[in-house]
Amino acid sequence: MKDHPITIGFDDAAFNLKSKVRNTHLIGVVCQGIRMVNVVQADIEIDGNDATEKLIGLVKQNEEHVQYILTHTITFGGFNFIDLERIFNEVKKPIIAVNDREVNIEAVSNALIK
């Protein structure tokens, strides 16, 4: 691994499920080591199915430089899941999804029922 690898990390913007707004932002931050070098964003549907496609597009804007992809979980905008295998196959970059806490299966089940 290089001394200062170039990574792109993704997370979604906050949103309110009770609002009539149906989109939120998918935000990517490109860093070289600890230095931020670029920020990219795309709108994604809340509980939609476009996060994978949008994430791939954002990576491709920087693919010449980016060496690794990091994501905060595998869901964005509620239940808009990303397909890690498809992302890897299309951009040929290692991708790591990070959870900062244990998933509450009961809360997920309740949200899906609603």
Language-model-derived ranges and their functions:
Residues 9, 28-30, 97:
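Structural beta-sheet core signal
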Residues 52, 56, 81-88:
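Generic internal hydrophobic packing segments that stabilize the cores of diverse globular domains
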Residues 2-5, 64-66, 92-93:
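Short coil/turn connectors at secondary-structure junctions
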Residues 14-16, 73-82, 101-104:
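Gly/Ser/Thr-rich loops at beta-strand to alpha-helix junctions
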Residues 83-114:
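Long, charge-dense
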